[in-house]
Amino acid sequence: VQINSGVAVLEEEGVLLDKLVVKAASATLTAGTDYTAAFDDNGYVNIVVIPGGAGKSATSLTVSGVQIDPSAVTPADIVGAVSAAGVESGMECIRMIFPKLNMVPGILIAPGWSENAIVSAGLQAKTTRINGVFNCVCIVDIDSSTNGATKYDDVKQQKEKQAVTSANCYAVWLYAKVGDVLYAGSAMAAAVTVATDADNGDIPNVSPSNKTVPISAACLKDGTEVLLDQEQANVVNSFGVATWLNINGFRLWGNNTACYPGNTDPKDRWFSVRRFFCWDDNTFIQTYFQKVDSPANKRLIEALVDSENVRGNSFVSRGICARYELKYLESENPTTNLLNGCITFHKYMTPFGPAEDIEELVEFDPDALSTALAQ
């Protein structure tokens, strides 16, 4: 590799920096002492020769190492497993997020892979009871390759073929194109979703649907552009699948989770409501975990009820929920449960759903003519 102005550019993608072997003539250079290596915006490796190092007078470098091969990855690798030795891989590593980082997964995605039925099934399964207690959602792609749905009216059949049915799943059809670069719909939809959360105080009560996104086209996996009008996009939505719609700029279009239309329960079908339920449950667990193993007395019960209802009143006053109230009901806490150290609280929660249809009724009033012309 030729050195120009102290920098050698290795024009290869997927190179592992910690496996690089860099030589100047016959001398092997040491990372951090003789050179530094980093990726540029193209994914190439920039090797900077350090003045005073062993390669200071070199005009070229000999570079070898390990390069990843994305084509060798299989759906089974993405789903993962637990080996006989207890080593976790793929989606099995989701379990490790909270104990390692103390962060609860919010959205699971596998761009470029979730259009595979095995992967999408794995993602849906992993959204519930993470670490035994937490819940989240996933965003998956409906296959738009030649083997999938290439027309909007094929989406229903392809969704069923992929077995995408979970209330914790948001399905997206079509890739997004920015310039000449294609992005999986699931990746772009996830970005729109978290951006919407950030614009609303990190509370996931607002639907990402109808939020503009800076893309230049919606397309099939092979890059073929697809122009959907609102009527066609609504048909896709009726299958429980979101897509991209261009009305004064591209926007994500669709409020329903993948359980729709088979399940029309508002807490399950609306993506924003479903996410709010997951988020609120996870927040409750994290907030009051410190109370676990405290004396199960009246003071503990009142503290939890009062604290949660103060929070709930804030949600109601800000128009986030129509109702948010926590109660301790004696009927749900028999003596046998209390003796076993189990306390149950009952929460009444109604986050506002999206205004998916706004209709106008227009009436012609003939009497207004005579009134207007009366002398």
Regions from the PLM with identified roles:
Residues V1-N4, D34-N46, S144-S145, A176-V178, ...:
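Short, ordered beta-strand-loop transition motifs
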Residues V1-S57, S64-P70:
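Extended beta-strand solenoid/passenger and fiber regions
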Residues I3, A8-E11, N42-G52, T243-Y260, ...:
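Generic recognition of long tandem-repeat/solenoid scaffolds
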Residues V9-L17, D69-V82, P99-V104:
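Structured, mid-chain assembly/scaffold modules that mediate subunit interfaces
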Residues S64-A72, A76-V82, C321-Q375:
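Compositionally biased, low-complexity/repeat regions
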Residues A84-T287, L329:
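A glycine- and small-residue-enriched flexible loop/hinge signal that marks low-structured segments
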Residues W270-S331:
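Acidic, low-complexity glycine/serine/threonine-rich segments
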